[in-house]
């Protein structure tokens, strides 16, 4: 869930631990001094001062290191909240596409906040914690919008006599640890209890962990979730801001970890076929059009679903009748020429005029060829379909391909476990 760039600072209660960096109004996360010590090139991203890349490694080197080893990413700009109350599941179901009632405790799911017309307000991860709350993470670029949305809906919910309270986690940073060596590195640097937790934590599962790298706070513990935005095995650690800087520094002492910036994070997520809100997802797109029908829980697909799914009339109609979907999100792959940039028009030999548009694109470091995500008319979405992308007033051949471009390596819970 890499949030689209916004040129102004987000000034919200949930980021109260962040301080001003300079006259531009950018905000610092608790890892700011770590970034500077590692020679980061900082940019303003969604109003935050964040690293685009680090000294001694170019973007491709950073990308490949995550695919082969372990990289850490500062994602503290994202919006972290807890939903408390006896009716917390009903509250979040009333805002999203997910079936939380049937989601096992200790696990999470990707989801989308929905508008009344079925459009996507934001994408998010909802964790149904063993503790009496939901832990939710969504995008920084949408933080102000979603904060206001949650506050308004909480008031409406309370007036209806139901019990749900939104807690904005302004005192927590968020560190993503990604790559095939992530598990080993974390396991070697926790307590016996922590090792037992990690040994029984699989993809999209979440738990409190008492200690990492010798750091702990029993009154304000860290939460670790086995998930990420790269397609690799990995974790996201929600850490009290007072421990964040030392956690990053101690991870670097292992000599097995490298810090990774936003540029490589974007190429990693694109290879993994993951959406970027503001590019691949928006308020004008439904989950079905975004090829995310699987986010609509089976129970929520019933007209009698309680609560009803937001925008259900349109979404359920699209699920039942493919003719209701005029365009869909797809993956396309090309050669080694210029990159397909967002907004580039897509053409076909079969009809005159554009058939779609690129929403994200890059030269894949893993594949050595251009890949992109795009929205095209439904009749042009079959894998193997030959298309052309207009780049600098020239047409370059691309082929519709299945997503993800690079197979993911998530460690899923065995079915018999």
Please annotate each region the language model reported.
Residues 2, 12-114, 119-121:
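Acidic, proline/glycine-enriched N-terminal capping motif
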Residues 2-5, 14, 18-46, 50-54, ...:
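Conserved, structured C-terminal
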Residues 98-153:
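Well-ordered mid-protein domain cores that form the structural environment of catalytic cofactors
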């Amino acid at each position: 869930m890499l949030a689209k760039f916004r040129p102004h600072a987000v000034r919200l209660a949930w980021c109260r631990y962040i301080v001003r960096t300079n006259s531009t109004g950018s905000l610092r996360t608790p890892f700011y001094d770590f970034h500077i010590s590692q020679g980061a090139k900082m940019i303003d991203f969604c109003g935050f001062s964040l690293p685009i890349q680090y000294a001694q490694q170019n973007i491709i080197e950073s990308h490949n290191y995550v695919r082969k080893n372990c990289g850490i990413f500062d994602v503290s700009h994202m919006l972290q909240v807890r939903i408390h109350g006896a009716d917390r599941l009903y509250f979040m179901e009333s805002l999203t596409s997910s079936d939380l009632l049937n989601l096992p405790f200790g696990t999470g799911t990707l989801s989308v906040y929905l508008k009344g017309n079925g459009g996507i307000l934001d994408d998010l991860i909802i964790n149904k914690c063993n503790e009496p709350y939901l832990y939710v993470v969504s995008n920084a670029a949408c933080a102000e919008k979603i904060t206001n949305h949650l506050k308004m809906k909480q008031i409406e919910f309370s007036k209806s006599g139901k019990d749900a309270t939104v807690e904005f986690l302004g005192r927590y940073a968020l560190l993503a640890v990604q790559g095939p060596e992530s598990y080993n590195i974390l396991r070697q640097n926790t307590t016996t209890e922590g090792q037992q937790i990690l040994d029984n934590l699989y993809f999209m599962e979440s738990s409190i962990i008492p200690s990492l790298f010798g750091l702990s706070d029993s009154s304000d513990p860290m939460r670790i979730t086995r998930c990420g935005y790269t397609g690799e095995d990995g974790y996201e650690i929600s850490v009290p801001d007072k421990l964040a800087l030392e956690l990053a520094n101690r991870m670097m002492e292992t000599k097995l970890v490298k810090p990774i910036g936003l540029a490589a994070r974007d190429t990693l997520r694109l290879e993994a076929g993951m959406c970027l809100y503001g590019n691949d997802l928006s308020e004008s797109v439904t989950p079905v059009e975004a090829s995310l029908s699987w986010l609509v829980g089976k129970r929520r697909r019933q007209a009698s679903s309680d609560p009803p799914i937001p925008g259900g009339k349109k979404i359920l109609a699209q699920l039942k009748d493919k003719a209701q979907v005029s365009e869909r999100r797809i993956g396309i792959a090309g050669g080694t020429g210029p990159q397909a940039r967002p907004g580039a028009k897509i053409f076909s030999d079969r009809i005159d005029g554009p058939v779609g548009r690129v929403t994200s694109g890059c030269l894949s470091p893993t594949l050595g060829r251009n890949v992109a995500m795009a929205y095209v008319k439904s009749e042009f979405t079959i894998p193997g379909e030959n298309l052309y992308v207009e780049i600098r007033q020239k047409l370059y051949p691309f082929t519709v391909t299945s997503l993800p471009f690079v197979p993911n390596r998530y460690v899923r819970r065995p079915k018999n476990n």
